[in-house]
Amino acid sequence: MRMVCMSDVNDELDGSPILEEVLGDALGKLKVFHVKLAAEGEPRGLIGPRDVGIIWERHILNSAAIVPFIREATAKRQFKTVADIGSGGGFPGIVAAACLPDHQFTLVEPMERRIEWLHECVDEMGLDNVSIVRSRANAVIEAVRGSNGGRKGRGEDAVDLDGNPIPVRHPFAVVTCRAVAPMTKLSGWTLPLLDKGGRLVALKGRSAQEEIVKATKEISKNGGIHPRVVEAEVGPGLEPTHVLMVDER
């Protein structure tokens, strides 16, 4: 009996016009990403076995739902910089970077095997607007705030999990993430990375508004204002997702 390769499993949206409608010019690069995810994502622990036939909707289109919100947040900025915290399998960072080639993305992920995956994806997709840092968020915050917050020299001392200096010295216009942590923790991992007037854009589940209520103190403590949740379209006829946003005062 022949073993079924995960790449042999058809995706429900393969060939759908929804893909081109939502992803536009990024579709070619994201097809490369989809093929790689279908073949390697489950055995490498990046997606669940039940996700293989719904990668387009659950992971790629869901991640792409934040793209309009990133564009809105950077519309008036000269430097369109985005940090993606806890990038994991590339959601939403790899997808958003493919959709926004005029933005510079920094993917932050602590796990070595996921870092290896992200580097492979960037190389195979030909993404030249992505840098990858193997680090936890607090070390990147130290690199940014130590260089820009008046603590002379401390930012230069910040190192990644391989002991290398973290090549980040400026706060970001936008910070993104998906399924990383509740807002009580996420506030302290993301908001300190934002430039003045920057914006956190996080993909969340149905409990997003409850998370805001529980994290009111943490959001304010870390300089966040105007926390809100909006329903974001994933694609025509598909279930929408939720985007949680917080501005940096």
Curated annotation (Swiss-Prot):
GO molecular function, one term: rRNA (guanine-N7-)-methyltransferase activity
Binding sites annotated in the UniProt record for S-adenosyl-L-methionine: G86, F91, R178
Swiss-Prot/TrEMBL keywords: Cytoplasm, Methyltransferase, rRNA processing, S-adenosyl-L-methionine, Transferase
Pfam families in the record: GidB (PF02527)
Localization terms from the record: Cytoplasm
A GO term from the CC aspect: cytosol
Keyword rRNA processing: yes
Record-annotated disulphide pairs: none
Membrane spanning stretches: none
Origin superkingdom: Bacteria
Enzyme Commission no: 2.1.1.-
Keyword Transferase attached: yes
Protein family (similarity comment): Belongs to the methyltransferase superfamily. RNA methyltransferase RsmG family.
Function of the molecule: Specifically methylates the N7 position of a guanine in 16S rRNA.
Record's protein name: Ribosomal RNA small subunit methyltransferase G
Gene (UniProt): rsmG
